[in-house]
Structures are given as structure tokens and as C-alpha cells.
Amino acid sequence: MNNDHLTRRVEALREQIRYHNYRYYVLDEPVISDAEYDALMRELRALEAAHPELVTPDSPTQRVGAPPGEQFAKVQHVVPMLSLANASDEAEVRAWYDRVVRLLGNDARVAFVVEPKIDGLAVTLIYRNGILVRGATRGDGETGEDVTANLRTIPGIPLRLGAFASNPEGQTNGAPVQAVIPPLIEVRGEVYMRIADFLRLNEQLAASGEKVAANPRNAAAGSLRQKDPAITARRPLRFFAYGIGQIEGVQVQTQWETLNLLRTLGFPVNRDARRFERLDDALAYCREWMTRRDELEYEVDGVVIKIDSLAQQAQLGVVGRDPRWAIAFKFPAREAVSRLIDIVVNVGRTGVITPNAVIEPVNIGGVTVRNASLHNADYIAERDIRIGDYVIVKRAGDVIPYIVGPIVARRDGSERPWQMPATCPACGTPLERAEGEVAYRCPNFGICPAQITRRIEHFVSRGAMDIAGIGEKQVQLFVERGWVQDVADLYTLTPDHFANVEGYGPKRVANLLSAIAGSKNRPLHRLIVGLGIRYVGEVVAQILADHFGSLDALAAASADEIDALEGIGPAIAASVAAYFARPESKALIAKLKRAGVRTEAQETARASRGNALAGKTFVITGTLPSMSREEASALITAHGGKVSGSVSKKTDYLVIGAEPGGTKFAKAQELGIPMIDEAGLLALIGSGRTADDQATPASDRRAATASVPPSDDAPGSPRQLDFDLT
């Protein structure tokens, strides 16, 4: 076989295998037997083994090709992967629809796409010129983990895109028809595990003495985050695509078109997605799903209702972290009956005493539940919940177990009423209860060991300072040995502390201390979250960081100054001011500074909000000198601006590079839209001047670009299709 013929045969085999993968994973309609498929793979592997120079990264044989890694790199999402607002009943869905109609106008025609809400792990996949170049987890919605090597092992995720609208005529086993592949496309979807596959996996893990997973979602998440891709490859993971983050060269107008495009490109798309013109029909389909829940081959925790039109999605926008154009209609929580063995209290980081139920183990939705929330003392008293009662246990949102109430008819007289203890179980301090509040608190803020432990656990958590390698056991060790009395003491730990501690070898200690040191430069809002101030979560912390810019400025602010900020109410303001008024808080900030922790906002972070780009829409055309279009888009959005894929009256500025697209350039001239180049964009961001100071009027731009012939704008610039769902 000569080289040309060999090359053609190898490529033909790859195309056939990709096509049959599409038939199997996307259409669920294979046209060849497993034996025939295996024969194709064997031939391809044999040819590549004999001629390694023909091996390419996108070959079907190369799904497992990366060595085990120590950790996953962080990935910044260009388009945020947002969460979803939830509805627990049809009334809440209709209320959402009423808000949509008010925002769009009563005469707007609205269609809906209803999709199953798969209970898995949200991921994003980036393809350049049809080749998978990066895959990442959702993470916190803005930053995820690079798990490309592991995602490549999932058979349903194409390594190379194709257009599979039809099989070539007369070619039962032939290659698919090819069409235009987007130069850039970011695909969003869900990695999951079928219930039957999950049960088989647990049997295998148990037989080999390994820890079994609690449910399919945990199994999928754990499998995807294996350090060794070879382990992930052995796990029965699957993938459904449901959205696009950004795209070049292809325009879609609706969510329904998006799903069809994804299917055509070779991605598995859930066949149960439906489009409806009327909300009543969409809700009827949701009810049908609820009745079929236990018949499905995979776990779902609800359905997602989306506005079909992408233009209407853009008009509706986002509130907080939730898109206004979609809602998750959650299924009723699963429930079971168990016996209440005891009620114990936990001490939170702010001193709140929370009662928790210890129950006889019971399986709810695939999870063995031994503890459940009782909320507060009033909740227990109002429902007359007693130790020894048979109680109804639910998992709210299929996640958090809680006690609904007792089954009074099953009482036999042995049940005992419960009362909140008078003193803190951790330090013995008398508990207090403020007027008008339901919570009891331990006021021993600076000394109570339970509060110290909880504050440190909160400080190192992913939503705060995100210090890898420190969990509940490590914090308990630090506190019990007297090494750490507050969060600032973490930065005083040295190798000597661990010299005689079993399980802490040199490498583990080095990694631990490196992670602690690396957290010193976290964004200011993460540090504010980490302090554990009552009522202060990520959103409030971001508002405070953006406005004050440093812990010193925030600490010096009065409650009235804080209350004046949009999004901050009097209760939050009072809590923040009270926290920083405490002597121990002032001492803690001083210790953090001495330890080298950044207590001021980074300039680039502060510039990302409220600067000259805020509220402005940019379009990028041509090749920029020092950055890709994706990087330029990220830069603009990081500094408060928006990026669009086409020029319109709503466009504020056109960023021009070499060989600009003729369509965009001409449209900008027609509309008189100001134009800036990369240097102007960077100067704008760096100087804080308005973009108009950097812009060249469209009428003056012709001479500067006359030597560059306008090109057809076919590939287009990245078109960001709003926000993704999880």
C-alpha cells in the first residue's frame, strides 16, 4: 500500500467511525453491528501503530492520550455559565411568564423550548476549526477546571466536528456528508451517568473494595475529576449538549435552531426536548414528565423552560446570576419515613445554634440519609416534633434532607419532647436570642472553639478563599493542636508544625503551604466572603469590594454609608458595620495584612465594573495584533462591556484589526459608529477615558483602511449567545 493510498484509507476509516459514533450516540440508531464497528477500530489502530506519523490528536483512537495530572488548571469562562431560577409549582411558572410578557411587551409572540434537567455535571467544550481544544467544568459559573483530557474519553463527545444531516447515498458504512464547520464554537452540556450504568459501576467498586458513589450525579462528577484520564475512560459517562456559549461563522436565531445545529454537528441532544407555542402546552408536557420520572434511564430533577427566541433572550437579560428567559420547573422532592433517634445542635461560624435530626438510615433518591435539618427551635415546637417520633423526611431540591413533621398516629408514648440547651455545647456560654429572631446564638465570638472552627472552614471553602487541601479534618487538627485561633493564623503555619503528625509527609505539607500562600492574592470580594460576616454572601461582597476598594475603607464606613449602596439593606449594613467595629475584627485585619494577604482590590478587578466600558457594546472585526478575538471579548466583558457579533444601531464601538470584515466595516460607516483599534481599546481600559476619546469617526476611517480590501465577513466574529444553563 503506497503512502497516498494508506493516508486515504486511514482518513476513510476515521470518517466511517465518526459517522457510526454519531449513529450510536446521537441518533441511537446504529446501522452496523458491534463486531463490524470493532473491526473498523482494529484496522485503524493497526495502521496507526504501523505508521505513527499518521496519528492525529482528533483520531478516534486518541481519546485516552494524556498522562495523569496532579491538579486541574483554572479556566475563565468567556461567557458565564449561570444558574437558573427555580419554580416549585405551575403558579410560579405562570408568574415567571407574566414577568417575561411585561418585559417583552404584551403584544410579543413567545414560544418555548422544554428540556429535561439532567442531574449531572455541567461542562463547556471549545472547538476551533472543528477540533476539540478545551473542555472545562462549570465551577462557580465564572471559573471552572480544565478537564479536557478526561472529557476526550467520553464517547459521546466528538473530538472532531462533522455535519451528519444524512448518510451519503449508497454508502451504508461510508463517511458522512461534510458541511461548513464553525471556526469557533463553544458548546455547553451535561455529563451524566445512566442509572443502570451507575448500579453496575457500584457493584464493581464494591467488589474491588473501593468506595461506592451515593448517586449517579456523584458518580459522574467523581469520574470526570479523576487525575488519570484512563480511569475516566473506564467509567460509563455520557453527554448531552443543550446550548452554545459563543460561535463564529454560523448564526442561529432560536434555541430550537441551536439544538438542531448541535445535533447536526455530531453532539448528542436529548430527544425529549420539545418546542411549544403556548405555555399551557409546555406545562402539560412538564406534567407528563413528572409522571414518567421513575421510568427514565437517567436521573432528572426537573425540566427547564426556555424562551425560544435568542433575540428575546437578549432583550430579557439576566438578574443576579439567573437569566430572565429561562426557569427550572423542579420536580417534587422525594420523601421517606424514618425514626428520629436524637436531636443535636451545631454551632455555626456566626454563633447560630442549629438543631439537626439524627435519624435511622433511610434511602431517599439514591442517597442514604442519617441526618436531617430541623431549621430552628420554633420549627420543632410548632410541629411538636419529639425524639422517638416516626417522621417524614424530604430532600429539598433533591439535595438537602429535612424533617417535614411527625406521624402522630404512630406514637406509642415513649417519645420525648426536646428543648434548646441553655448553654453553648462547645464553650458553655449562655445562649442568647435577640428579640424578633428565631435563632439562638452563642455570643462568645472570639473564643468559642466551634465558631473558630466553622469560621476557618468557611474561610478556606471554594466560595471564599478556595484553599485546596484543607477541609473539616485539617481544620480540626489545626484548632485542637492550638496552631490556629483565627483565619490569619493559617498563614503562620510552617513545616515544623507538621513534623510529627502522621500522614503529613514533606510533599503533602509543601502542597498545603503552597495553597495557603497562593490564597494571599485572592480578589477582595473573596476575602470579604471569607470573613464570614452575617448576611454577606458573594453578591453583597462584590458590591462592597467594588465600592470601597479595600478592607480599610470598608471597615471605616458607617452603617449609613453602607446602607446607601444599591443592593444593600439596613440589616446587612448594620451587620457589616458591627463586624468591623469589634476589636477582634480590627485585630484580625491587622494580622492578615502582616501575613501578606491582599486587602485591597486589584486595579484590573475594580476596572471591570463601573468604568468607561460599562454599558457599552463592542463588535470586533479583523485580526488583532496581540490577542485573539476570544481574548479581546474576555477583556471587554471583564471591564464591564458587552461583545456582539454584528453591527447594529445598538453598537457603540467597532474594534478593527487587520483584514476587517467588509460587512461590519460598511455597516459601521453607514451608521456612523466610532471605530477604535487594539491600541485604542487598551488605552481606553488603561486610562479610564471614554471610548469616544480613542475612537476614529467612521468617516475618517476610510483612508486608514483603504489599502486593506474588505473581505466577506463569512467566518464572523464570536457571536455570544447570551448565557448558559446548568
From Swiss-Prot:
The keyword Cytoplasm does not apply. Residues 608-698 form the BRCT domain. It catalyses: NAD(+) + (deoxyribonucleotide)n-3'-hydroxyl + 5'-phospho-(deoxyribonucleotide)m = (deoxyribonucleotide)n+m + AMP + beta-nicotinamide D-nucleotide. Its cofactor is Mg(2+); Mn(2+). Its EC number is 6.5.1.2. InterPro entries: BRCT_dom, BRCT_dom_sf, DisA/LigA_HHH, DNA_ligase, DNA_ligase_AS, DNAligase_adenylation, DNAligase_N, Hlx-hairpin-Hlx_DNA-bd_motif. One of its GO terms (biological process) is DNA repair. NAD(+) binds at D34, A35, E36, Y37, D38, S83, L84, E115, R138, E190, K306, K330. GO terms for molecular function: DNA binding; DNA ligase (NAD+) activity; metal ion binding. Zn(2+) binds at C424, C427, C442, C448. It holds the Pfam family DNA_ligase_aden. The active site is at K117 (n6-amp-lysine intermediate). Residues 690-726 are annotated as: Disordered. Keywords: DNA damage, DNA repair, DNA replication, Ligase, Magnesium, Manganese, Metal-binding, NAD, Zinc. PANTHER family: CHROMOSOME TRANSMISSION FIDELITY FACTOR 18, REPLICATION FACTOR C SUBUNIT 1. DNA ligase that catalyzes the formation of phosphodiester linkages between 5'-phosphoryl and 3'-hydroxyl groups in double-stranded DNA using NAD as a coenzyme and as the energy source for the reaction. It is essential for DNA replication and repair of damaged DNA. Belongs to the NAD-dependent DNA ligase family. LigA subfamily. This is DNA ligase. The lineage of its organism: Bacteria, Bacillati, Chloroflexota, Chloroflexia, Chloroflexales.
